[in-house]
Amino acid sequence: MYMLTIGLLTALGLAVGASFGKALGVAVGSYFTACIIIGIIKGALRK
């Protein structure tokens, strides 16, 4: 489930990056990645 979500958010980040420019795209991609990692860590800690 996580892999599917990561894939979708990565694709979304790349699409946004292609639309608004590489620098902003990298920032958006990094932000999404950080959110995903934090979410996985929080989910793992709850179990």
UniProtKB/Swiss-Prot annotation:
Superkingdom of origin organism: Viruses
TM regions (residue ranges): 24-43
Assigned GO CC terms: host cell membrane; membrane
Membrane topology, from the record: Single-pass membrane protein
Main localization of the protein described in the UniProt heading: host cell
UniProtKB keywords: Host membrane, Membrane, Signal, Transmembrane, Transmembrane helix
Compartment(s) of residence: Host membrane
Span of the signal peptide: 1-23
Descriptive protein name: Protein 0.5
Native source organism of the sequence: Escherichia phage T7 (Bacteriophage T7)
